[in-house]
């Protein structure tokens, strides 16, 4: 199972939001590439990068920071946030991004997901963000009335092989990851699932591994020193 550290970007800086609230932001690093290099040294084989400005705007914003992260030796990058057109997807893949994570597009533009999967096979993932069971889009700012399993089934049919599921209500709150919900989603939709949101310690990593998930994304717990990446990588491999 993969442990995937997260780098969230606003204004070219590494930040974390509390419950996805843009008004509750903490800046953790001014240099994203330096942070990425540190994560690679600690054992990261994949880094989850989110362009939060892009998620809000609807197109990629932090391209300079993304380019710098991709240039770090040993850094394999997946990028989400504002990827809602084929030219934008192509642009970030050309920067060196390995996988794109489509969130809003997975709900509003299933045709785009299909086209992207056909054009860039194996490089398109879907981010499904839910609060109280309802899928949220546009940087978690808009509700959809849809459930996570329904969206996961749709993107699987469109060609997506892996879904990253975030419980928005837990994100940045250290309340424990929803490994059970992620495993249920994996079983119901028949697609590989990576869990995200609420990771508080190594027990969450072990819970995700025990649930048979493809991976777990670790963000704030890493930046607040509640979890060491090297230890988490070891726990995932136990």
From Swiss-Prot:
Annotated coiled-coil positions are none
Q: Where are the transmembrane segments?
A: none
**What subcellular compartments does it reside in?**
Cytoplasm
Report whether Isomerase shows up as a keyword of the record.
Answer: yes
Q: NCBIfam families given for it?
A: 1-(5-phosphoribosyl)-5-[(5-phosphoribosylamino)methylideneamino]imidazole-4-carboxamide isomerase
Which keywords accompany this UniProt record? Amino-acid biosynthesis, Cytoplasm, Histidine biosynthesis, Isomerase
Annotated Gene Ontology cellular components are: cytoplasm
Q: Which GO terms describe its molecular function?
A: 1-(5-phosphoribosyl)-5-[(5-phosphoribosylamino)methylideneamino]imidazole-4-carboxamide isomerase activity
Disulfide linkages recorded for this protein, renumbered to the chain, are none
Q: Name one GO biological process term.
A: L-histidine biosynthetic process
Q: Which HAMAP family match?
A: HisA (MF_01014)
Q: What reaction does this catalyse? A: 1-(5-phospho-beta-D-ribosyl)-5-[(5-phospho-beta-D-ribosylamino)methylideneamino]imidazole-4-carboxamide = 5-[(5-phospho-1-deoxy-D-ribulos-1-ylimino)methylamino]-1-(5-phospho-beta-D-ribosyl)imidazole-4-carboxamide
According to the UniProt entry, what is the EC number of this protein?
A: 5.3.1.16
One Pfam family, short name:
His_biosynth
Keyword Amino-acid biosynthesis in the entry? The reply is: yes
Q: What is this protein called?
A: 1-(5-phosphoribosyl)-5-[(5-phosphoribosylamino)methylideneamino] imidazole-4-carboxamide isomerase
Pathway field of the UniProt record reads: Amino-acid biosynthesis; L-histidine biosynthesis; L-histidine from 5-phospho-alpha-D-ribose 1-diphosphate: step 4/9
Positions annotated as active site in the UniProt record: 8 (proton acceptor), 129 (proton donor)
Tell me what gene encodes this: hisA
| Similarity comment | Belongs to the HisA/HisF family.
């Amino acid at each position: 199972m993969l442990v995937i550290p997260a780098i969230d970007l606003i204004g070219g800086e590494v930040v974390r939001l509390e419950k996805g609230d843009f008004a509750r932001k903490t800046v953790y690093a001014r240099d994203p590439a330096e942070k990425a290099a540190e994560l690679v040294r600690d054992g990261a084989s994949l880094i989850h990068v989110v362009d939060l400005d892009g998620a809000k705007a609807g197109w990629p914003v932090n391209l300079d920071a993304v380019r710098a992260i991709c240039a770090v030796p040993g850094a394999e990058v997946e990028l989400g946030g504002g990827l809602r057109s084929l030219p934008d997807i192509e642009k970030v893949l050309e920067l060196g991004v390995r996988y794109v994570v489509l969130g809003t597009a997975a709900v509003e533009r299933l045709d785009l997901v299909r086209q992207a999967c056909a054009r860039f096979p194996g490089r398109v993932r879907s981010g499904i963000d839910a609060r109280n069971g309802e899928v949220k889009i546009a940087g978690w700012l808009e509700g959809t009335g849809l459930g996570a399993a329904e969206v996961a089934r749709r993107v699987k049919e469109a060609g997506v092989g892996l879904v990253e599921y975030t419980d928005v209500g837990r994100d940045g709150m250290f309340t424990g990851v929803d490994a059970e919900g992620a495993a249920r989603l994996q079983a119901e939709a028949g697609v590989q699932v990576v869990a995200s949101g609420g990771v508080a310690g190594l027990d969450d990593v072990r819970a995700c591994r025990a649930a048979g998930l493809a991976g777990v994304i670790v963000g704030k717990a890493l930046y607040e020193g509640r979890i060491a990446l090297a230890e988490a990588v070891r726990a995932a491999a136990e």
